[in-house]
A protein has these predicted regions:
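Internal active-site segments that recognize and position negatively charged phosphoryl groups
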Residues: 172
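Conserved "HGTGT" condensation-loop signature of ketosynthase/thiolase-family condensing enzymes
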Residues: 1-108, 112-155, 175-178, 194, ...
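Catalytic metal-binding/acid-base residues of hydrolase active sites
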Residues: 191
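Short, high-confidence coil segments that cap the C-terminus of an alpha-helix
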Residues: 181-185
């Protein structure tokens, strides 16, 4: 089989330097740093007090408030980046739905959601855990929600390979296109693990400075 040439036609990002590619690139060129004091929880009892937090991202730019409440933050960040990449590519998702696949990784998935719902269960009883807990927490939900949101009907999967996940997803997407399985792939990675349990765990394994 002849190998297809693979090109990148659209870019999208939500990260500590900016909530889109233009702002991120401008900040990087200006030498700005996305690392700063953690603001999402009290770090007074933690050795590590710094992280790269996404600031000012409005999930309602991609989903309505009701739907956003049913999704973990990593999924919302992935949707924001995917929306920009799809728009940047100029592809017609409705016309090309059968030809577009999704490979989006997450190493931990909805870790803050797991913490929140565990605390809720401990305080109010486990029967009070949200019915959306499982679909919010599982790592493949970013890829799934992108496919659902944009009506994409090609392959949809999530490699869970820790810090290499995003690169893994891009590599897998490259092979899917090159080898003729799908003409188009939406690919990348999303993470949101700046939480007491996440920072505590990475600190204990001495992976943070």
């Amino acid at each position: 089989m002849e190998k297809r040439r693979v090109v990148i036609t659209g870019l999208g990002t939500v990260n500590p330097l900016g909530n889109n590619t233009a702002d991120s690139w401008a900040a990087a060129r200006a030498g700005k740093c996305g690392i700063g004091p953690i603001t999402q929880f009290d770090t007074s009892e933690f050795k590590c007090k710094l992280a790269g937090e996404v600031k000012g991202f409005d999930p309602e730019t991609v989903v309505d408030k009701k739907e956003a409440r049913k999704m973990a933050r990593f999924t919302l960040l992935a949707l924001g980046a995917a929306a920009e990449a799809i728009q940047d590519s100029g592809i017609d998702c409705e016309a090309e739905a059968e030809n577009i696949g999704v490979i989006v990784s997450s190493g931990i998935g909805g870790l803050p959601t797991i913490e929140e719902q565990h605390s809720r269960g401990e305080e109010k009883g486990m029967e009070k855990v949200s019915p959306y807990f499982v679909p919010m927490a599982i790592a493949n939900m970013a890829a799934a929600q992108i496919a659902i949101r944009f009506g994409l009907k090609g392959m949809c999967t999530c490699p869970v390979t820790a810090c290499a996940g995003g690169t893994n997803a891009v590599g897998d997407a490259f092979h899917r296109i090159r080898d003729g399985y799908e003409p188009v792939m939406v690919c990348g990675g999303a993470e949101s693990c700046i939480s007491p349990l996440g920072i505590g765990g990475f600190t204990s394994m001495k992976a943070l400075s």
